């Protein structure tokens, strides 16, 4: 239970579980409860205390570290800086909306002197484990640049999903996933007109629209599984995409001290969603892992290269970085970013050996083992491991252990996965030597953890007693 002193009003009546359907309908026109802000009624300080206890418990129960370990007793979930709001709002630079049908009473709104349609299609989101999306009036966690667009006012007939992005430079990219039963050209024309009416000259507002047909299975759109967070469509080949007004990628910039890194990230590509997360994670990686000039490093589950760029800058012209990523969209970004003239190379990494590999991490670790044995790459010094919420698995960790790196930095968005994999690494002879956690998802139950592992000292063998 949440102590009364730690309670606070939720961020909007759509997120208030204590409000009645009638109260929500009267305030927003939408009676349903919106998910995604399950900690919104708890003070931020209490949220971080809860998350600290969760990380400690998972590392203890699943990873085997004793609760009295200084790594756990000294752990505090750290707050990330927020530019626009200090209540844990307006931090999401990436938001995926589902589109849901909303029935209205004819004539309850006026548009150009005509009665509004009885049915409109609005942006929505899935409540926790719900099969149907709920219309969104305002999503308080979204960045202000996205909230100010008021996407809920668009009639998105023919659209299945909307992916909204705002870059560190303030450019907005809206990707519309179009139902294959509709003409993508007609849908694009209609939405572009609505956007121009609502926002004026899109180029001046730095807004780009991008339309993609949804893939189908047996002629029907693929459906989203209840409770699933995975995208129910695959990306179609570039030739089958329709580009709307503007670009289909954004430029992200990350600074840490005097270092500045640039990245090109496509629509649908992966990037950290908290505005302050990229700089925080790069700084944390550099201070914990301490990559040195001339070292050989691995960046596993590398995405567009957030850590790859910083690693390459640190190891310099005499060092090596191997990046492995499975997503075709994100891998394509990484290949472009780290081409000889790629935007993610710095003056210090202009001549760094950077290998960008697409595919399954566990499988390619076998290839790296072979490359090591034949002297094709130098001995591996440091590894960044940043898997998805499911974490790495025993096979991946055993193959990584076989490469015999000196240190491993594990970045985890699920403390249970980190706890499980900590237990596996300890079995393989690794010690956790540093642990930090960050409130990268305020007003939700999610938390980011970063752990540094080093090879445990070899234990002396017990001396056998001599027998006569």
Q: How would you label these PLM feature ranges?
A:
Residues 1, 104-128, 170-176, 208, ...:
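Short, well-ordered strand-loop elements centered on a beta-strand within folded domains, enriched
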Residues 1-163, 167-169:
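Extended interfacial segments that mediate partner engagement and assembly in macromolecular machines
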Residues 40-42, 139, 177-179, 266-270:
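Short strand-loop junctions, especially beta-strand C-caps/beta-turns
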Residues 93, 172, 294-295:
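Nucleotide donor/acceptor-binding cores
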Residues 99, 127, 176-178, 265, ...:
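Flexible glycine-/small-residue-rich
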Residues 130-215:
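Internal alpha/beta scaffold segment
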Residues 182-468:
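Rossmann-like S-adenosyl-L-methionine
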């Amino acid at each position: 239970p949440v102590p009364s002193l730690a309670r606070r009003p939720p961020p909007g009546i759509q997120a208030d579980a204590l409000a009645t359907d009638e109260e929500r309908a009267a305030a927003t026109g939408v009676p349903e409860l919106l998910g995604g802000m399950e900690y919104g009624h708890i003070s931020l300080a209490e949220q971080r205390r809860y998350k600290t206890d969760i990380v400690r418990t998972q590392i203890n129960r699943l990873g085997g570290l004793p609760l009295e370990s200084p790594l756990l007793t000294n752990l505090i979930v750290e707050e990330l800086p927020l530019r626009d709001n200090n209540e844990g709002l307006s931090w999401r630079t990436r938001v995926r909306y589902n589109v849901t049908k909303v029935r209205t009473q004819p004539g309850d709104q006026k548009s150009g002197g005509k009665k509004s349609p009885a049915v409109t299609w609005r942006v929505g989101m899935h409540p926790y484990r719900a099969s149907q999306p709920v219309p969104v009036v305002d999503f308080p966690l979204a960045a202000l640049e996205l909230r100010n667009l008021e996407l809920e006012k668009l009639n998105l007939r023919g659209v299945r999903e909307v992916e909204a992005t705002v870059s560190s430079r303030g450019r907005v990219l809206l990707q519309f996933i179009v139902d294959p039963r509709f003409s993508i050209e007609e849908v694009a024309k209609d939405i572009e007109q609505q956007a121009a009416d609502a926002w004026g000259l899109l180029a001046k507002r730095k807004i780009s629209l991008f339309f993609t047909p949804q893939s189908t299975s047996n002629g029907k759109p693929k459906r989203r599984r209840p409770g699933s967070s995975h995208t129910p469509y695959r990306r179609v080949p570039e030739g089958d995409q329709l580009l709307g007004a503007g670009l289909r990628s954004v430029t992200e910039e990350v600074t840490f001290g005097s270092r500045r890194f640039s990245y090109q990230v496509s629509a649908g590509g992966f990037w950290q969603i908290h505005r302050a997360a990229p700089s925080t994670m790069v700084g944390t990686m550099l201070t914990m892992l301490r990559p040195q000039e001339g070292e050989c490093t691995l960046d596993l589950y590398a995405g567009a290269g957030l850590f790859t760029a910083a690693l390459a800058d640190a190891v310099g012209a005499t060092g090596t970085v191997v990046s492995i990523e499975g997503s075709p969209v994100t891998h394509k970004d990484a290949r472009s970013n780290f081409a000889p003239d790629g935007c993610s190379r710095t003056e210090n990494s202009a001549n760094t050996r950077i290998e960008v590999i697409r595919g399954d991490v566990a499988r390619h670790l076998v290839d790296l083992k072979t490359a090591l044995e034949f002297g094709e790459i130098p001995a591996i010094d440091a590894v960044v491991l940043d898997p998805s919420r499911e974490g790495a698995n025993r096979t991946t960790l055993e193959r990584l252990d076989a490469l015999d790196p000196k240190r491993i930095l594990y970045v985890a968005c699920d403390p249970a996965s980190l706890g499980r994999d900590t237990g596996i690494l300890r079995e393989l002879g690794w010690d956790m030597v540093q642990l930090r956690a960050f409130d990268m998802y305020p007003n939700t139950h999610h938390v980011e953890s970063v752990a540094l592992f080093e090879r445990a000292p070899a234990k002396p063998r017990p001396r056998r007693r001599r027998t006569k």
